[in-house]
């Protein structure tokens, strides 16, 4: 990564259940990756958010980094959580009634407004300021996005639709 990171702004996204061992690697990462300047901090609504973000802030500062006010977004609006749950079940190969703790416990993984982010991160104003700096440095527009439909890989003699139907029926039979 270090060989290809010139000109990039790197952000360390801690694991959801971040341990002291995870945080202990920050000084080493910061030394080897000059573009690493930030640690992502998100509200996960598990009851430990303030303590967890404070721990991330201390570890980031000790490594010469700063935290960013981020939002672990999985969908754009709370009412899209059921779709996220279905996608999680597909990824994990389980049914919705057996997914249990594989699913997020609430519908808070949606985009938050600037006002809501300011409220959530009022204890860490530097995190909000750093997030603004990173966002302002980004040169992105939705017009840069264009969907490129992938080439269909289907058996000889089949159409994409007939192959999908065959796979669907085979999966349903299992």
Language model: regions and residue ranges:
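Phosphodiester-processing cores and adjacent nucleic acid-binding clamps
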Residues: 1-174
